[in-house]
Amino acid sequence: MATYLDLQYATENQEGLPSEDKFQQWFEAAVTLFQSDAEITIRIVDVKESQALNLEYRGKDKPTNVLSFPFEAPPGIELDLLGDLIICRQVVEIEAKEQDKPLNAHWAHMVVHGTLHLLGYDHIEDEEAEEMEYLETEIIEKMGFADPFAAEKE
């Protein structure tokens, strides 16, 4: 098995952010259910960059927790590159606090969620959302974290 993570910290302050080993662990927990070889870039950004990218690519003028940009190889070329995840530090921290979740659990959830998007999963239709939520919960719980959707299910 070969997984590769290119981690980019593009934040003013990196204090308190999870280690590269943690990001690698979370990525591998999600991707290895589907394929043994994979490459990903995870870029940790501040609000300004998240908001600019969310506006440009989704038409939403606000920061968001995670954006996924799948890599589309030209025909005839096979690469293990899944794509890029852009995760906004401040949004993740605010959401974890609002949802009363441990911060590392929410970081792990964002990596798993984004990786599933890169693997082709989505949550636009109800049926797809249920499948994606099931996978996220299964992966997160295997890592020892609580169900990320527990509060919504109560």
Swiss-Prot record:
Entry's Gene Ontology BP terms: rRNA processing
Subcellular location field: Cytoplasm
Cellular component aspect of the GO annotation: cytoplasm
EC number in record: 3.1.-.-
Gene Ontology MF terms: metalloendopeptidase activity; RNA endonuclease activity; zinc ion binding
Cofactor: how bound: Binds 1 zinc ion.
InterPro entries tied to this protein: MetalPrtase_cat_dom_sf_prd (IPR023091), YbeY (IPR002036), YbeY_CS (IPR020549)
Gene3D superfamilies (UniProt xref): Metalloproteases ('zincins'), catalytic domain (3.40.390.30)
Stored NCBIfam families: rRNA maturation RNase YbeY
Task of the protein: Single strand-specific metallo-endoribonuclease involved in late-stage 70S ribosome quality control and in maturation of the 3' terminus of the 16S rRNA.
Protein name (record): Endoribonuclease YbeY
